[in-house]
Amino acid sequence: MYIAGVMSGTSLDGIDVALVHIEGSGVDSKIELIHFTTVPFCNDMKNEIQQALSIETSNVQLICSLNFKLGLCFANAVKEVCKEANFPLRQLDLIGSHGQTIYHQPKQEGNIISSTLQIGEPAVIAYETNTTVISNFRTMDMAAGGQGAPLVPYSEIILYRHQTKNRLLQNIGGIGNVTVVPSKRSKESVIAFDTGPGNMVIDEVCQRLFHVPYDQNGWIAKQGVVVDEILTYCMNHPFLNMKPPKSTGREQFGEAFVTELLNRFKKHSKENILATVTMFTACSIVHHYKAFILPYYEIDEVILGGGGSYNNTLVEMLRNGLREEKCSICIQEDIGHSSAAKEAIAFAILANETYHRNPSNVLSATGAKNSVILGNITFPPYADENEANI
């Protein structure tokens, strides 16, 4: 099957689309990446999304409108990846669309129950592409008592399980998340959880203090020095000592977190603040390994993915933090994969599993009570001989 996986993450840097060919289903699936592209959000769209993400500025009319606007953006991004790959859109069997997360409440707080909302109307995507769309992957896991995240571990088992090596898959997107993938000969279970901020705090500081979207290659942070009092403040965040399974997001490490941090520590130089929040991401990852993984698993290899794997300063901080551990550290490209395409590929794989009526949540990752089939199915408006028959 030819499937387009569509991902718009918490970093808001654009729409990632992976055109993937998948043979079979389950852990023995054969996955081939045909083409990957990122379609950036225009400034107006990015501003609308940021407005919708903030409780202070959001409103129901905006979210309602944005749901349809993003659906059109996602459809156009699918058309773009097919155009770049010289692949006929009519031959596409499925689209797996994660959507744009507007709010994620992993655990109940008072009368606010655990819930999640991703937008990007699948009917618009299906209409514009005349292709079956599978979307809204997180809600069924939450209905089954899970946190709806992380969902990527299922794809990581398929793509990265090694015959003899125990691997850690560390994604550094807006949020950091880790998956422990034991070797095929191991009897240990897969576990996965969010490790805290990935690029989210770094990018927000860059945009506010340096007026650039992100710290390319970690060059700005390299000019500063880590400030202990800022790092201690960050590392005291209660999320870090919660036991897995757990997930987090912009609600904990978004604009409000950065505003409070900058107000508290405005006496320090811009470069030092950026260096410190970069170290915060590295230390939060290392902390989670040492607290929740390394005492129970012998790890051979750490594989970094996501945009943060291109931040050389951050990667060097991670290497220093893990220097005493007996494991190698590499990035996705070192083993023939794409750091940028990883999550979009994951949602193509999840769409394929839903098409085959296979459960694809990992209970040890999300905390769900049951293995469940993820996602909602939206059929295209017109019958087509190439349409996937679900």
UniProtKB/Swiss-Prot annotation:
Keywords: ATP-binding, Carbohydrate metabolism, Kinase, Nucleotide-binding, Transferase
Enzyme superclass (EC): transferase
InterPro entries on file: Anhydro_N_Ac-Mur_kinase (IPR005338), ATPase_NBD (IPR043129)
BP-aspect Gene Ontology terms: 1,6-anhydro-N-acetyl-beta-muramic acid catabolic process; amino sugar metabolic process; peptidoglycan turnover
Enzyme Commission numbers on file: 2.7.1.170
Chain segments annotated as transmembrane: none
GO molecular function, one term: phosphotransferase activity, alcohol group as acceptor
Keyword Nucleotide-binding: yes
Pathway in which this enzyme or protein is active: Amino-sugar metabolism; 1,6-anhydro-N-acetylmuramate degradation; Cell wall biogenesis; peptidoglycan recycling
Catalytic activity: 1,6-anhydro-N-acetyl-beta-muramate + ATP + H2O = N-acetyl-D-muramate 6-phosphate + ADP + H(+)
Top-level taxon in the UniProt lineage: Bacteria
Gene3D superfamilies, per the entry: 3.30.420.40
Sequence positions that bind ATP: G9, T10, S11, L12, D13, G14, I15, D16
Record-stated family: Belongs to the anhydro-N-acetylmuramic acid kinase family.
NCBIfam families, per the entry: PRK09585.2-1, PRK09585.3-2
Role this protein plays: Catalyzes the specific phosphorylation of 1,6-anhydro-N-acetylmuramic acid (anhMurNAc) with the simultaneous cleavage of the 1,6-anhydro ring, generating MurNAc-6-P. Is required for the utilization of anhMurNAc either imported from the medium or derived from its own cell wall murein, and thus plays a role in cell wall recycling.
The protein's name: Anhydro-N-acetylmuramic acid kinase
Organism: Bacillus cereus (strain ATCC 14579 / DSM 31 / CCUG 7414 / JCM 2152 / NBRC 15305 / NCIMB 9373 / NCTC 2599 / NRRL B-3711)
Gene for this chain: anmK
